[in-house]
Amino acid sequence: MSIENSKEAALTAELSLAGAFFYTPECPDIEHLRSLSVANRWLDTDLPISDDLKDVAKLTPAEREFYRFLFAFLSAADDLVNLNLGDLSALFTQKDILHYYIEQESIEVTHSRVYSAIQLMLFGNDAAARARYVASIIGDAAIGRKVAWLQAKVRECGSVAEKYILMILIEGLFFASSFASIAYLRTHNLFVVTCQSNDLISRDEAIHTRASCCIYNNYLGGFEKPEPKRIYELFSEAVNIECEFLLSHAPQYSHLLDIGAIISYVRYSADRLLGEIGLSPLFNAPKPSPSFPLAFMTVEKHTNFFERRSTAYSGTLINDL
């Protein structure tokens, strides 16, 4: 190596080392999503969940059991996602990605607190009754199947890229039927504040899903990506698990829900996610009708949902759930 080349290599190494101690823009797409998430910050204290207590009595016993089940799962699911985030963020040196994950973990804490408050409200603020229910439902087969499937697939992961496919499935599919089921309450003017929180959380998860897709597409160059056959296999299994999860506790006779429409939405969501990572659709599910509560969910500006506090939401990100 010539003296000139040696000096250039030394300078490059020096600059690289120095770059570890200050922020340099490297990932414009991820930085955009981080900035969007910051602009959309909200707090669990923004939402007076107790205002919805009056609507609990308006549910049938089967409907009440169904929503208690959903929120028991959702309360636990955010902890599962946070555990995975801590593992994934250590893979990157780009500060844009590290900063994004810090922001995501922060909002997941808000989600967890809101879910806990809604869950307690569904038990008439009886903490002991809630605790007994959670202790009995935590071993439910439908929840257990989701967790067992995810744990098994993490153990089987042949690459970091495949783990990102799992993150896309967690964030984009494993909440889809729950979000849709909660959104149906809005169509009957029930649980207004709970539906408000569902709007905000589902939009946050849209950002998280988009970020996972961006990282998978653009920042895993050093990792071998799974074959399309493997990705389709994972998507197919995840959709089946999500649909069975819904059917396992959905009330058989309820005017609140359209179970068929929710299942179609889950499949449509899977096809959209496949498109985000450059693959053809698997289910060819139709786009939800305009009457579907989540059909036009976007991360766009909405102010004063119920005239208590401005909860303006910025951006134009399409929901990838």
UniProtKB/Swiss-Prot annotation:
Residues involved in Fe cation 2 binding: E108, E171, E205, H208
One GO CC term, this protein: host cell membrane
Root EC class: oxidoreductase
A biological process term (GO) from this entry: deoxyribonucleotide biosynthetic process
A Pfam family: Ribonuc_red_sm
Cofactor(s) needed: Fe cation
Assigned keywords, A-Z: DNA replication, Host membrane, Iron, Membrane, Metal-binding, Oxidoreductase, Transmembrane, Transmembrane helix, Viral latency, Viral reactivation from latency
Membrane-spanning intervals of the chain: 165-185
GO molecular function, one term: ribonucleoside-diphosphate reductase activity, thioredoxin disulfide as acceptor
Catalytically driven reaction(s): a 2'-deoxyribonucleoside 5'-diphosphate + [thioredoxin]-disulfide + H2O = a ribonucleoside 5'-diphosphate + [thioredoxin]-dithiol
Subunit structure: Heterotetramer composed of a homodimer of the large subunit (R1) and a homodimer of the small subunit (R2). Larger multisubunit protein complex are also active, composed of (R1)n(R2)n.
Protein name per its UniProtKB record: Ribonucleoside-diphosphate reductase small subunit
Organism: Equine herpesvirus 1 (strain Ab4p) (EHV-1)
Lineage, uppermost ranks: Viruses, Duplodnaviria, Heunggongvirae, Peploviricota, Herviviricetes
